[in-house]
Design a protein with these regions (language model features):
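Bulky hydrophobic segments
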Residues: 1-100, 104-124
Length: 124
């Protein structure tokens, strides 16, 4: 019996999820504010942190190389910064350092969680 949750399939699923996540985050970050849905009603900062936490974890799982996670975290933080700065060019959006900080924090935590999961699965 072949297991469909092989390491290769998990990596592909994480890569697919991360790719969809990057597209969704870009779309939600750059669309007019009036049309943007609020998924977490409590705080938009929490939305940023959770979105980038998921991106970081899925990206780390797709990468499967824990020794390079610091570069991955830096790349995701740069992505968050570019999207936040891009909002300065849009009339219906407002860029804020607090949003960037929440995104960066979520990305770092997410990549760390992904790296821990990779290391844990490697020791089994």
């Amino acid at each position: 019996m072949k297991v469909w949750l092989s390491d290769r399939n998990l990596k592909l699923a994480a890569l697919f999820g991360a790719s969809l996540g990057y597209c969704a985050v870009a779309l939600l970050s750059l669309m007019p504010a009036a049309y943007r849905p609020h998924i977490i009603v409590v705080s938009d900062k929490l939305e940023h942190a959770v979105a980038y936490l998921l991106l970081g974890a899925l990206s780390a799982l797709a990468m499967r190389q824990p020794r390079h996670v610091h570069r991955l975290a830096l790349a995701i933080v740069a992505y968050a910064g570019i999207l936040e700065l891009s909002q300065l060019l849009l009339p219906s959006r407002v860029a804020s350092f607090e949003d960037f900080a929440a995104s960066a924090g979520g990305a770092i935590v997410g990549v760390s969680i992904g790296a821990l999961l990779i290391r844990r699965s490697a020791t089994r």
